[in-house]
A protein has these predicted regions:
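Hydrophobic alpha-helical transmembrane bundles of multi-pass membrane proteins
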Residues: 1-177
Length: 177
């Protein structure tokens, strides 16, 4: 039962990532229809192929074994999807870009500045998201072990690198030479 809840949370996060690409662009009923179709036709098959030792795993009769196989039929290079890197981030990212291209620009795009209007709530949301990703990545090791610690540290290092890049980008954009 716990694993079902864990997997449903991953599906909810994947659809939430796509929702950021279509804010102010589609009606809610249309969005719910899209989510149902996307989870059924894209997310669930991809989860089965990557996380269940099927088509895209390290099993001997998969695509990775045929493309990068050794003489004994095992995959020499197999995808490692820790905490949903390909299933969640890649599939929802590509789907979000495709959806944004199909739907078109936002109505308010380039008409008014898109600044955060409630900075404490923005920071609270960022902190909650940070805690959630640390939990997802650490929890994907299914135990308090070295793998969970490495996942936690990698998540922290990636967040710090992103923050430094954001600060550098804001400094480059907002200052004049």
């Amino acid at each position: 039962m716990i694993d079902i809840g864990f997997q449903l949370t991953f599906a909810a996060i994947a659809t939430a990532l796509i929702s950021g690409a279509n804010a102010e662009r589609v009606k809610f009923g249309t969005w719910l229809t899209f989510v149902g179709l996307w989870v059924t036709l894209v997310y669930c098959p991809l989860v089965c192929m990557v996380w269940n030792d099927d088509l895209l795993s390290a099993a001997s009769e998969d695509i990775a074994a045929h493309l990068f196989g050794t003489h004994d039929g095992r995959a020499a290079i197999a995808p490692i999807d820790f905490a949903g890197g390909s299933v969640i981030e890649v599939s929802s990212g590509v789907s979000g870009v495709v959806l944004a291209l199909v739907v078109g620009k936002r109505r308010s795009f380039l008409r008014s500045p898109q600044r955060p209007h409630n900075f404490p709530m923005v920071m609270l949301g960022a902190a909650l998201l940070w805690f959630a990703w640390l939990s997802f990545n650490g929890g994907s090791a299914f135990g308090a072990n070295g793998t969970a610690a490495l996942a936690w540290m990698n998540t922290t290092a990636a967040g710090v690198a992103e923050l430094l890049g954001l600060i550098g980008n804001i400094d480059c954009v907002t200052t004049t030479p």
